[in-house]
C-alpha cells in the first residue's frame, strides 16, 4: 500500500483548464476573459504608423501625400527619401522602387495625355472659329459679287444685258439640294450671322415657312426662347431651296407650326 502525504499532494501541479490549453496551442487566440483589454498605447501607435489601414484606396493615400510638403527642385529620389524619413520608413526595396517607377511613368503619361486633350480642344475651337469666319466672308463676297454683276448689267447700254439683270432679280433661281447639306456647317453659318440678320431670318422663317404671325412674341423680352425647339440649321437651310424644304420637312414644319400656335395662344391669354 502506497501512502501519499498531504505535502506531496500540495506540490503536485494542477491540470490546466481546457480553455487555457487551447490558448497555448494557438497563441494568436485571445481568451474571452481578456478580449476587452486594450493594447498598450505605444503598440497601437506603432502599428498605425507603420502599417496602412486595410483596404486603403490609392486615392486616399494620394490625398495625404498631396497635402505633405515637398522640396521642389530636388530629384525624385531625394524627394522620396525625404518623405520616407518623415514617415519613419526605411529605404525602398527593389520591388518598391519598381512600383514607384511605374507610378511616375503612369503619372507622366496621364499628364501628357491631358495636355494633348487640352491642345486638341483648343485647336478644334480655333478651327471652328476660323471656318465660321471663312463661311461668313465667303457668303458676303458671293453676295457682293452677285450684286456687283447685277448692277453692272443694269448699267450696261446693251438692252439684252439689262433684261438679263431684271430677269435674274424677279425670277426665283433653282435652289440647291438641301438634303446634301452638312448640318454642322449650316450651324456655323448661323453663328456667323449678326443679331439683326438672325432676327430677320427667324421672322422670314416663321412667316413664310410656318405661316404664323410672330408679332405677339416680339412684345416680350427674350422671346427667342420660345422658338428654341426649331433647329438653327433649318433657319439657314430653308433659304437655300424653300420649295424643297417645305416638301422634305413637311412633318417637322407642321409640328413646329402647331407648337408655335400653342405658345402664341398662351401669350395672348397672359396679356
Swiss-Prot record:
UniProt lineage: Viruses, Riboviria, Orthornavirae, Negarnaviricota, Haploviricotina
Subunit structure and binding partners: Homotrimer when phosphorylated. This trimer is stabilized by binding to the L protein. Binds soluble protein N, and ribonucleocapsid.
Encoding gene, per UniProt annotation: P
Keyword Chaperone on entry: yes
Signal sequence, renumbered to the chain: none
Similarity field: Belongs to the nucleorhabdovirus protein P family.
Annotated function: Non catalytic polymerase cofactor and regulatory protein that plays a role in viral transcription and replication. Stabilizes the RNA polymerase L to the N-RNA template and binds the soluble protein N, preventing it from encapsidating non-genomic RNA.
Post-translational modification: Phosphorylated by host kinases.
GO CC aspect terms: host cell cytoplasm; virion component
Spans annotated as Disordered: 1-26
Keyword Chaperone recorded: yes
Record organism: Taro vein chlorosis virus
Keywords: Chaperone, Host cytoplasm, Phosphoprotein, Viral RNA replication, Virion
Subcellular location: Virion; Host cytoplasm
This protein's name: Phosphoprotein
Amino acid at each position: 500500500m502506497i501512502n501519499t502525504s498531504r505535502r506531496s499532494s500540495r506540490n503536485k501541479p494542477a491540470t490546466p483548464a481546457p480553455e487555457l490549453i487551447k490558448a497555448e496551442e494557438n497563441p494568436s487566440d485571445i481568451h474571452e476573459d481578456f478580449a476587452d483589454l486594450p493594447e498598450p498605447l505605444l503598440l497601437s501607435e506603432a502599428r498605425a504608423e507603420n502599417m496602412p489601414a486595410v483596404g486603403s484606396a490609392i486615392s486616399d493615400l494620394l490625398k495625404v501625400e498631396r497635402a505633405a510638403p515637398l522640396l521642389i527642385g530636388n530629384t525624385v529620389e531625394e524627394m522620396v527619401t525625404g518623405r520616407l524619413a518623415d514617415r519613419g520608413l526605411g529605404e525602398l526595396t527593389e520591388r518598391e522602387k519598381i512600383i514607384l517607377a511605374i507610378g511616375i511613368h503612369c503619372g507622366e503619361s496621364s499628364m501628357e495625355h491631358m495636355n494633348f486633350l487640352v491642345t486638341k480642344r483648343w485647336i478644334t475651337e480655333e478651327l471652328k472659329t476660323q471656318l465660321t469666319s471663312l463661311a461668313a466672308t465667303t457668303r458676303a463676297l458671293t453676295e457682293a459679287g452677285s450684286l456687283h454683276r447685277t448692277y453692272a448689267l443694269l448699267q450696261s447700254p446693251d438692252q439684252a444685258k439689262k433684261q438679263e439683270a431684271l430677269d435674274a432679280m424677279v425670277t426665283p433661281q433653282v435652289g440647291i439640294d438641301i438634303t446634301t447639306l452638312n448640318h454642322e456647317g449650316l450651324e456655323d453659318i448661323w453663328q456667323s450671322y449678326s443679331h439683326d440678320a438672325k432676327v430677320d431670318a427667324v421672322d422670314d422663317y416663321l412667316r413664310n415657312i410656318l405661316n404664323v404671325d410672330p408679332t405677339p412674341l416680339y412684345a416680350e423680352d427674350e422671346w427667342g426662347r420660345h422658338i428654341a425647339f426649331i433647329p438653327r440649321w433649318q433657319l439657314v437651310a430653308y433659304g437655300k431651296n424653300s420649295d424643297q424644304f417645305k416638301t422634305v420637312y413637311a412633318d417637322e414644319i407642321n409640328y413646329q407650326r402647331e407648337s408655335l400656335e400653342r405658345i402664341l395662344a398662351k401669350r395672348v391669354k397672359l396679356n
